[in-house]
């Protein structure tokens, strides 16, 4: 799907869910800054992260492509496991489900896993 225009809202809509983040997209995002928007009462609260690792994973099913992205973010605010609006300044917005996977001195790592028919 084409570029999804950034919104000032953290709201997730059908257009955002329909946009597939592909392996090619993930490779372009490697080591790039991305922002997750946390829904708030009045406005979205941005959490700036860095794409720390992009890795393709083997699939037992034919024609299925699998990969993961690890995002490195600040200690606070901590994002819980859920789907967020993720924004890249040049590539636009996606709906991405992330899970916190590790906490170290000064940062928290989050992972998103993807799988789609290639």
Where are these regions (language model features)?
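Conserved hydrophobic positions within beta-strands
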Residues: 51-53, 98
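Short conserved beta-strand and strand-loop elements enriched in small hydrophobics
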Residues: 32-41, 82-89
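Short, compact, well-ordered microdomains
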Residues: 83-118
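C-terminal segment of N-terminal export signals and the immediately downstream linker at the start
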Residues: 2-37
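Short solvent-exposed loop/turn micro-motifs enriched in small/polar/acidic residues
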Residues: 27-29, 77-80
């Amino acid at each position: 799907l084409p570029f999804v225009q950034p919104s000032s809202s953290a709201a997730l809509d059908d257009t955002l869910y329909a946009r597939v983040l592909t392996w090619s997209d993930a490779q372009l995002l490697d080591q790039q800054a991305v922002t997750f928007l946390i829904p708030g009462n009045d406005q979205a609260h941005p959490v700036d992260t860095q794409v720390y690792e992009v890795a393709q994973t083997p699939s037992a099913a034919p024609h299925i492509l699998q990969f993961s992205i690890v995002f490195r973010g600040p200690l606070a605010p901590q994002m819980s496991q859920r789907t967020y609006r993720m924004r890249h300044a040049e590539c636009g917005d996606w709906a991405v489900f992330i899970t916190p996977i590790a906490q170290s001195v000064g940062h928290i790592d989050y992972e998103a896993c993807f799988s789609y028919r290639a």
